[in-house]
UniProtKB/Swiss-Prot annotation:
Its cofactor is pyridoxal 5'-phosphate. Substrate binds at R129, M298. The gene is alr. It comes from the Bacteria. NCBIfam families: alr. Belongs to the alanine racemase family. InterPro entries: Ala_racemase (IPR000821), Ala_racemase/Decarboxylase_C (IPR009006), Ala_racemase_C (IPR011079), Ala_racemase_N (IPR001608), Ala_racemase_pyridoxalP-BS (IPR020622), PLP-binding_barrel (IPR029066). The modification N6-(pyridoxal phosphate)lysine is found at K33. It holds the Pfam family Ala_racemase_C. Catalyzes the interconversion of L-alanine and D-alanine. May also act on other amino acids. GO terms for molecular function: alanine racemase activity; pyridoxal phosphate binding. This is Alanine racemase. Its EC number is 5.1.1.1.
Amino acid sequence: MRPLNVQIRLGNLRHNYRILKEMHGGKLLAVVKADAYGHGAVRCAFALADLADGFAVATIDEGIRLRESGITHPIVLLEGVFEASEYEAVEQYSLWPAVGNQWQLEALLSRHWKKPVKVWLKMDSGMHRTGFFPHDYTSAYAALKQSEYVDSIVKFSHFSCADEPESGMTEIQMEAFDLGTKGLEGEESLANSAAILNIPEARRDWGRAGLALYGISPFGGSDDRLKPVMRLSTRIFGERVLQPHSPIGYGATFYTSKSTRVGLIACGYADGYPRRAPSNSPVAVDGKLTRVIGRISMDMMTIELDASQEGLGHEVELWGDTVNINTVAEAAGTIPYELMCNIKRAKFTYIE
């Protein structure tokens, strides 16, 4: 059997939730969209069932999957519905929809609901994706408030640069949000992972923990308060010694500078490892760091082995405990979200 494995450490997930909940205060949504950032939404949700105040997803299908698996917690649809007919499923499965534009608002208000719905009303405080502009927010809020079909309204927005403290953008967005919601009653939600960790003023009634929930610092590097949940590993299935000036891999982009011991490992870009990861990207053999050499192939890659490192059959960590996923992402010119969400053709093992 091909030895590409993903370990999901559910104990680390629970640890991270507790840390983030303590830091934020109030209530905390566990963001499990995109199959819990590649970790497995159902398994992660059940691991957090006795801790989480609620969950957040991106799509109706993601919410339905949690409900049909037995999750009874509040589930927020962060993007709301994509067509008016989806409000039927919102009601059937007791989901909390975000409303971030006029057609979503009108479709919700024109429907005859059997039971009142809790709405998350989004403001575009400066990211300019979805949400009502601050000068339009009060009228959208008033329309919902006047409806007999609306149970309550959570006011929320999303930060564009919370992981870039020096930008000043988060302060601008918070000011816009506070001015636009002045005098409007109800709960609020502003803090994503970066804000939970670093911006106390953004910690309102509800936090939304995504990346940090899975043990990854949104600021790059590592955060000693968090424990990585995902560990991606494989094994060496081939080994050889190459002479100096030997090319390796497609395009012959890497040449050995000396007699070099190399290992061939079972993971490639078809498994989700980024093809653009350059030579010198870190991996670890039995806990000792080494590097990728040559281009990433579809199904395999080549690593350098020193004289002290074991070879054939030994484990190679691609990211997890020894290899920080942020380091891999930075080397490949991408972000850890993309790496985790792209993993496939791997065996998943869940560790309680």
